[in-house]
């Protein structure tokens, strides 16, 4: 009898765990809908009730009440005790106040909207992606493109949403990866595929003695200049960052002491990564180095779970995968770099630095591998990016 009861209790626990996994997409959609409908922005102004929010936002009263209750159940909102004539009132939880309100310094709203409108749709075709071994943009968003960024940047609105999402990611954890190593000896820094320039501007603030350049595609550079003006520091000065446009698989790369590749290599297969690293090494000055920012798998590739899921995202949205430290060490060595070192700052990303070295791996031409065009900033769905 005791064994039977234990087995039954274990089965109940396993079934609950199974249902939590099966229903996980529902929780994601509650989060996404709350952001899209600006529920958390409304609650930031004061307690909200379903009837008033529905009326002011043009929503159905029934749907609004159900969504607010679900947000409260997930810990995104707090349902106040007691109910007035229009039903219960809701306020933001600390999590929502910090990460889900559009005006918060650490808001991740744009990132979540990007996940909802692109990554979530691709994940609906995971079985197809596993069968075919290729991205699922054609099924998910109707764009059948060899270059993943053609799909991500399928409209100017989507381009800006993606760039804002990356900017939000770096606002949360950019400083940690940029201070994992002391970058002050590097006087000229180039952020390859640096998007809006958020990480580059952070580097310029942290290392005021360095000149920082963002190398991006022409369309991204134009969008960065038009829509992402540099914030002034406390003394009113703007961090000095310049933008150069080009294709990092084809165009000449500017000379630098340090190249930063943040969430870039995970987009690409090994051959393209080696080709890009060789191009970077060819542009580095003597004594230079490359800083890689990635979510690194544990030895053997068995975890962490979040990084394993990100690797599937790369199957569905790009051509690459997440890798172990040993795999990054092998890639950099094939490109001629030496002494790869890994640091694990608090947060979702790891920082790796490899020295330019003096071997024969450098090559300054832009062809080879399976690289056909520049990806720009990593597709990382960072996914928030929580550990």
Swiss-Prot record:
Keywords: Lipid metabolism, Melatonin biosynthesis, Methyltransferase, S-adenosyl-L-methionine, Transferase. Substrate binds at residues 267, 317. Induction: Exhibits very subtle night/day variation, if any. Its EC number is 2.1.1.4. Expressed predominantly in the pineal gland (at protein level). Very low expression, if any, in the retina. CDD domains: AdoMet_MTases. It comes from the Eukaryota. Residues 356-370 have a biased composition (Gly residues). S-adenosyl-L-methionine binds at residues 153, 170, 216, 246-248, 263. GO terms for biological process: lipid metabolic process; male gonad development; melatonin biosynthetic process; methylation; negative regulation of male gonad development. Pathway: Aromatic compound metabolism; melatonin biosynthesis; melatonin from serotonin: step 1/2. Residues 354-387 are annotated as: Disordered. It catalyses: N-acetylserotonin + S-adenosyl-L-methionine = melatonin + S-adenosyl-L-homocysteine + H(+). Signal peptide: none annotated. The active site is at residue 266. One of its GO terms (molecular function) is acetylserotonin O-methyltransferase activity. InterPro entries: COMT-like (IPR016461), O_MeTrfase_dom (IPR001077), Plant_O-MeTrfase_dimerisation (IPR012967), SAM-dependent_MTases_sf (IPR029063), WH-like_DNA-bd_sf (IPR036388), WH_DNA-bd_sf (IPR036390). Belongs to the class I-like SAM-binding methyltransferase superfamily. Cation-independent O-methyltransferase family. Homodimer. Catalyzes the transfer of a methyl group onto N-acetylserotonin, producing melatonin (N-acetyl-5-methoxytryptamine). Pineal melatonin synthesis is severely compromised in most inbred strains. In many inbred strains, genetic defects in ASMT have been identified. Melatonin production may have an impact on gonadal development, testis development being significantly promoted in melatonin-deficient C57BL/6J x Mus musculus molossinus animals. This is Acetylserotonin O-methyltransferase. It comes from Mus musculus (Mouse).
């Amino acid at each position: 009898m005791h064994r039977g009861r234990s087995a039954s209790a274990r089965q109940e626990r396993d079934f609950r765990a199974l249902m939590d996994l099966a229903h996980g997409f529902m929780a994601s959609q509650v989060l996404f809908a709350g952001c899209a409908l600006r529920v958390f922005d409304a609650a930031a102004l004061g307690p909200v009730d379903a009837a008033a929010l529905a009326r002011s936002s043009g929503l159905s009263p029934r749907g609004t009440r159900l969504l607010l209750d679900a947000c409260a159940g997930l810990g995104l909102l707090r349902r106040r005790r007691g109910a007035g004539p229009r039903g219960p009132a809701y306020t933001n939880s600390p999590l929502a106040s910090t990460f889900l309100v559009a005006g918060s310094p650490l808001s991740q709203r744009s990132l979540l909207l990007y996940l909802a409108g692109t990554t979530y749709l691709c994940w609906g075709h995971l079985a197809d992606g596993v069968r075919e071994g290729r991205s699922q943009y054609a099924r998910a968003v109707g764009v059948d493109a060899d270059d993943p960024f053609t799909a991500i940047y399928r409209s100017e609105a989507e381009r800006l949403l993606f760039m804002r999402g990356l900017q939000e990611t770096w606002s949360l954890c950019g400083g940690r990866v940029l201070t994992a190593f002391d970058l002050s000896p590097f006087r000229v820094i180039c952020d390859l595929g640096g998007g809006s320039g958020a990480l580059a501007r952070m580097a310029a603030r942290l290392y005021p003695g360095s000149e920082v350049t963002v190398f991006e595609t022409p369309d991204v550079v134009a969008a960065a200049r038009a829509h992402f003006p540099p914030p002034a520091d406390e003394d009113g000065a703007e961090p000095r960052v310049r933008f150069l446009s080009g294709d990092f698989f084809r165009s000449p790369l500017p000379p630098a002491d340090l190249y930063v590749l943040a969430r870039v290599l995970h987009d690409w297969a090994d051959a393209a990564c080696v080709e890009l690293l060789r191009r970077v090494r060819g542009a580095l000055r003597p004594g230079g180095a490359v800083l890689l920012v990635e979510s690194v798998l544990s030895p053997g590739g068995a975890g962490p779970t979040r990084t394993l899921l990100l690797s599937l995202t790369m199957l569905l949205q790009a051509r690459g995968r997440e890798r172990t430290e040993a795999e990054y060490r092998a890639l950099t060595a094939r490109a001629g770099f030496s002494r790869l070192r890994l640091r694990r700052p608090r947060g979702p990303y790891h920082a790796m630095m490899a020295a330019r070295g003096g071997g024969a791996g450098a090559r300054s031409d832009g062809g080879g591998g399976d690289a056909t065009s520049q990806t720009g900033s990593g597709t990382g769905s960072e996914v928030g990016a929580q550990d």
